[in-house]
Amino acid sequence: MIKLFLLILISFSIFSNEEIEEVITTGTLLKESESKFSPVEIITAEKFDEIGVSTIAEISKYLSASSGSHFQTNTMDGVDQGMSAITLRGLDHASTLLLINSKRQTFTGTPSYNGEGYVDANIIPKIALTKMEILKEGATSVYGSDAVAGVINFITVKKFSGYKLDLDSQYSTNYNQNDIGFGFLFGKDFENFDLVFGFERMERTPLKAYEIDQISELSVSGLGNSFKILGDDVIESGLYAGEYSNGQTIPDPNCIENGGILDGRCRFAYGRGFNIVNDESHEKFYTSLSNRNHDISLIFSNVKVNDNPQSPSYPALPFLARDIEPGVGGSPFNVPVRWYGRPLGGRYPWRESPKDISQYHFNYSFLKDFENLSLETSFTHSQHENFHNRPDIVDSRFLSALYGNGGESGDLQWNIFDPSQNSIELVEHIKGAEISKKIGDLTTFDILAQTSYRNIN
């Protein structure tokens, strides 16, 4: 995506007897904007250190204007685990614009669970942050609909001399979870340029849902492995031996042995395998080279979500309206039944859905002051890439197996009534995953000119 922004600002000064003390303009691209005035809030790097957050987006917890931000593990919804959004005024993620040194960063190619694109705040290294400017009012007149809720501008270090080392360790007091961080910043004068280099790394250990009381216990699905019989029937022998009446719900007789919860029907405890906090690795690099006329910067970030456990498979929702005929899927019944379950339930191990998220932001700006003209031209290119692996089953293979045409040999049957009868070969054959690489990128050219002629600025 390529955008060209040309900003021309003209104001007329009208002299009269009325004295105008001061006019403040906020939310513009003017490099001399007086952002200290309301409604702009400034959060300095020192404030970040004082609060003690592990990542930039976690500052949302301490902002009164922030509501609906996303910066923690979201196992239940979407595919954007490992990404972060800072949201203002309770609007959706796409309504708050995040800038880096007043320049745009690309929206992610991966949407939130609501289908919204947003700027992933995980690109910003704390070690290289000078301050964070928050424009808490809408700024659509300058930035467009991306800024309905407001603008957040991250200002990075441009001039630094010497070395800076940050060591950070945060841990939960009641559970075995911790974040361990390391940051390094180096700066010096180099051939009439200010050179700054930064590196940051964080390792985050997981926190399982079952470690916290009354979390995973509440996460129970009725779609474990149960059946609704669609007619009166009598089974003389076997696992389902008995007499059944039309409309009766029949749970898996081996529900508990198969890892389910028996409560009227055979339920699936999906919460016990999920994480509250995922196992993550964060790495960020920052480089800046600048002087009076040139400003070059590059930020690179990589976030790996190493585990992110998911259910063995998701519910077989099409079968809520599809009858299982006698003999299909190992059915012992003489009449059709309706299946309330999932191909891989509680007896099967949980599967991991790792993520590998990389993004970068490059900017070159040329600045020149003439006698009556101040000119800034800049080129910015950014990209966000998310490699995504979400496990499930291959529907076509599962359906073939239900009808006895499964496996490489094409003659194996999947038994939904007695999962213990399913061979390892057939289990592996129906397994699959949604594997994708989603990329978002943005290229912008900015031209900003300021001049004055007589009474016109």
Question: What name fits each language-model region?
Answer:
Residues I59, L97, E133-L135, V151-V157, ...:
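Predominantly transmembrane beta-strands of Gram-negative outer membrane beta-barrel pores used
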Residues S84, G150, I180-F184, E283-T287, ...:
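Hydrophobic, lipid-facing positions within transmembrane beta-strands of outer-membrane proteins
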Residues K103-K136:
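Short acidic/polar hinge/loop motifs at secondary-structure boundaries
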Residues Y113, L218, T249-N278, D295-D446, ...:
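Surface-exposed, low-complexity loop segments enriched in small/polar and acidic residues
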